[in-house]
Amino acid sequence: VVPSAWAANYYGNDGVTKVPTGANVTLNSGNYDAVYGGYDDTEVSPPEVFKNNVTITGTAATNIVCGAYSFYGNVRENTVTISGNTLGNVVCGGGTGAADAIKNHVIIKANSVVNANVAGGVAVKNSEGNTVMIIKSSAANVYGGNGGTSSKGNSVEISEGTISNSVYGGYADNDNNSSAEKNNVTISAGSKVSGSIYGGCAIQNANENKVSFSNVAE
C-alpha cells in the first residue's frame, strides 16, 4: 500500500550513512521517501558510486528506489531488485546528475507494481550497458538506459509484464547532440505494452537498435 505521506530517506547499510560503494540494503517493511544503496554528493573529484545493491520485498513502501545516486560522478554496476511489492514512482539502478551511468541493473518480479518509471541507468551524459528485467510485474514507462548525450548497449526484457505507457531500450534527449545505438528490447510470454516500443530513441541519431517479440498477447 502506498502511503499518503512519505517518511525520511534511507541511505546505505544502516539507513543514515552515505557510502559510495559496498552497500547491501534489504528492506521488507517500513515507509521511506527514497532508498539509496550508494550515494555521493562530493563536487570536487567525485568518486564513482559503484557495486551497491538494494532489495525491496514484503510491505516496504517507498517513493523512489535507487541502487546508487551521484550528484557529480559516475554510477556503475549497481543493482535494484523489487519482489512482490508496490512502489510509488521511480526505480533506478543507477542515476547521476552530471556524469555517466554504466552497467546498472534493475529486476522487477513476483507481481510487483511500479506506478511510474523504471530505468536501469539515468545519466546527464552517457548511459551504457544498463539493463531492466520485468517478470510478471507492471510499470508505467521503462528505460534500459536514459542518457542526455548518448544511450548505448542498454536492454529491456519483459516477460508476462504489463506496461501502461512506453518502453525504451535506450533513450537520449540532448537537443544538440544525442544518439541511441545498439540498444535492445525483448517482449515475450504474453506481455502487454499499451504505449510505444522503441529499441532506441534519440533527438539526433538512432542506429542499430532492436525490438524483438515472442508470444506477445497485445
Which sequence ranges carry the predicted segments?
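Surface-exposed loop/turn motifs in large extracellular/passenger domains
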Residues: V1-A34, D40-I64, S70-N89, G95-N117, ...
